[in-house]
Amino acid sequence: MTRPVSYRKARRLAPMTTIIPATLSPRELAEEVRKLAVTPRDWMARVRLSAEGRWYERIHVDGQYEVWLISWLPGQATGFHDHGGSAGAFGVVFGALEEHQAGTPQRRHAVTAAPVSAGRIRSFGPEYIHDVRNTSEAVAVSVHAYSPPLAEMTRYDMIEGSLTRLDTEEAGQW
């Protein structure tokens, strides 16, 4: 008995890959913030003020990035925190904020403070740790963008010039 000849070509299968959505660079995030900051009429009606703490609302999210609105009464602050490996940018639309930038938990770094006035945008990479504060006497409103969307944030305290990790919050806990 003769067996039929098979002409099936052997195929090599490519290794399985995980598709990771492209992320935006700090510069691209700053551009997204700028676009929203110049059109407050499109979102200003959503802003609220809260004496209990900063008010915030996520106004955009997709696989690449997310955007938040945040309002700040005088004296409100974030405390030192990172962005869980996400890059970011923020811009002040109304009022003024003050940003205190620190190093990393592994590296001692002098804290630097810089004013961020209306119209100014700050952008940063994925290992950035900072504390943003409203040290003025007026309300402030800011726009924040992160890529990839925030999955977690770690909070820190500055003790004797070194960052000490306090806790990590996952998305949905804030």
Which stretches of residues belong to each language-model region?
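A short glycine-rich, His/Asp/Glu-containing loop-to-beta-strand
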Residues: 45-76
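Short acidic-glycine-tyrosine-enriched beta hairpin
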Residues: 89, 103-130, 168
